[in-house]
Amino acid sequence: MAKKVAYPVILKPDQEGYYVEIPDFDIATEGDTIAEAMEMARDAIGLMGIDMEDEKKSLPEPNSKAQNVEAGDTVTLVDVDFTEYRKRVDNKAVKKNCTIPYWMSVEADKAGINYSRVLQDAISNILGLSLIHI
């Protein structure tokens, strides 16, 4: 799955600001200003995308659905980096069991090593990811 994608959105002015249709995901959101509406669209796409990823579903291709554009509407693209979005909003800690030699455990305990931090740093380094410590 591509992790950074730009999807078309349709901004429709209304009495309260802007209604935003996101055709590729069959969802909508809204915002008081154009900037807020676009940020809400990015958030909606991000949430939908990581939910789909968790459910092992494929993300829709950009422009995969017809757009219903009317006079006064604005069509633009909203980019979403799903990897960065997940790091920002889905940062809950999970327990993982690992096994190390006893002697290493003794030495690490003496040194006050934080096992969770070491494991996070090592995995991030191996995967080439920037890390947000939890």
Write out the residue ranges for each language-model feature.
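Short, charged, surface-exposed hinge/linker loops at domain edges
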Residues: A2-A6, D43-T99, W103-A111, R117, ...
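Short aromatic-glycine-(Arg/Gly/Cys) micro-motifs in beta-strand/loop hairpins
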Residues: P8-D24
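A short, exposed loop/beta-hairpin motif centered on an aromatic-Gly-Thr core
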Residues: F25-A35, N97
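Phosphate-binding active sites in nucleotide-utilizing proteins
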Residues: L129
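Conserved small/polar residues in nucleotide/adenosyl-binding loops
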Residues: I132-I134
